[in-house]
UniProtKB/Swiss-Prot annotation:
The gene is pepA. It comes from Rhizobium etli (strain ATCC 51251 / DSM 11541 / JCM 21823 / NBRC 15573 / CFN 42). One of its GO terms (biological process) is proteolysis. Keywords: Aminopeptidase, Cytoplasm, Hydrolase, Manganese, Metal-binding, Protease. InterPro entries: Leucine_aapep/pepB, Macro_dom-like, Peptidase_M17_C, Peptidase_M17_leu_NH2_pept, Peptidase_M17_N. GO terms for molecular function: manganese ion binding; metalloaminopeptidase activity. NCBIfam families: PRK00913.1-2, PRK00913.1-4, PRK00913.2-2, PRK00913.2-4, PRK00913.3-5. Mn(2+) 1 binds at D267, D344, E346. Pfam families: Peptidase_M17, Peptidase_M17_N. This is Probable cytosol aminopeptidase.
Amino acid sequence: MSAKFEISFSKSVKLNGGLAILLKTAEADSAAGAETADPAGVIAKAAKIARFSAKSMATLDIVAPEGAPVERIVVVGIGKVGELTAHDWLKAGGAAASKVKNTDKVAIFIDVPGLETDARAAADFALGMLLRAYSFDAYKTKKNDDEEKSAKSVKVTIVTADATGARKAFSESEAIAGGVNLARDLVNEPPNALGPVEFAARAKELENLGVEVEILTEKEMRRLGMGALLGVAQGSVRPPRLAVMQWKGGKAKDRPVAFVGKGVVFDTGGISIKPAAGMEDMKGDMGGAAAVTGLMHVLAARKAAVNAVGIIGLVENMPDGNAQRPGDIVTSMSGQTIEVINTDAEGRLVLCDALWYCSDRFKPQFMINLATLTGAIVVALGNVHAGLFSNDDQLSAQLTAAGLSTNEKLWRMPLGKDYDKLIDSKFADMKNTGGRQAGSITAAHFLKRFVQDTPWAHLDIAGTAMGSPQDEINQSWGSGFGVRLLDELVRANCESR
């Protein structure tokens, strides 16, 4: 359960107990709000003793002296003014949220002397608090003291000169936090609780925000000829689903932008079974579908002025007596045939039918797919960058810029004919793996054969969607990577107003 912050904005606040959090730059002599929260001047003395330099995200925790208007004071350093970025405001909010303990009210002063704080910065700070506050403990029957206290509501007042503007900007921050935390929830859920049917039901709940949601059953997918996706699903007793989400916030004549997610709710590898060690993490093999679902939540919640489609292919890859075998040949919705070399290269089989369906039905301006697709991308990029593959330089540049803006970083990887020929098959139109070399690239080339002439990008998020290092705004195993990135892409390039 996430900590419950009731966040409001005000030009001033009357302090009466609780916690005061003050921001400080490295250059400033005093912290924001020091004259209000610290009339006795204890911050300067404590900072000198602790050698607190206000470097970025450093914190100083002080028990307020008797007679002070608050019980505790926390100073959060935000570094040098000239080096402060938009993402640093999120990090500062996260650092502040980590210090909210044993209190039900917090006043936060963010208008640092010498630094003009705008409404967007204040809203980003609040977003950082909401993202840091997330935790997933739905299945714990016994909680420690901190977990019990996090369930209680905390009133947070952020003091800033442009309180009205911050309040307006924060409505979008709440939408973003809702989408990111939805994606985190989906990735963190245990696989016995979140099968294809259950995941589709969670997507269906977006209708409450105005999203149109269709759920295609196995029978309907078979009628459409989705033999690649259905081949992956045939080893599981849990039936597959394809969820189609539409947000119609743009002009009726405008073609939609489209996002497609891999939703393998649990991946054993199938007949080409994975090693036992770490297999439990394969509950997160639907991180792409989770990100697409979270994005659709954000677009609807903030009433984005765009037409957007989100499609997620939901299957479970299991090795029963009916499972797909290495050597099988399946026919995709496109009519192209695929030789299955490795049943653990299943995500691309799910995506190829979803991509073709999306392109054929919606004729989108562009398609972006997200998938925890290959271990090879983790070897290449670790968990700092996601891999970016694209047939369109403009779309690639826009995605890269959005990644830098949100700190959800992408690194463009190569495509080329010499790689594409590695997936040619002797027995079918193509095979589903090209061998050990260039594994993430040949996987991207496989997908590229199903996008037709649509501008397209493939994000391989295997290293960033789950198990990434924890930081100021993410303490969760499932990170929600991709939601903020794609929302920024839409906001910067696609909205009609």
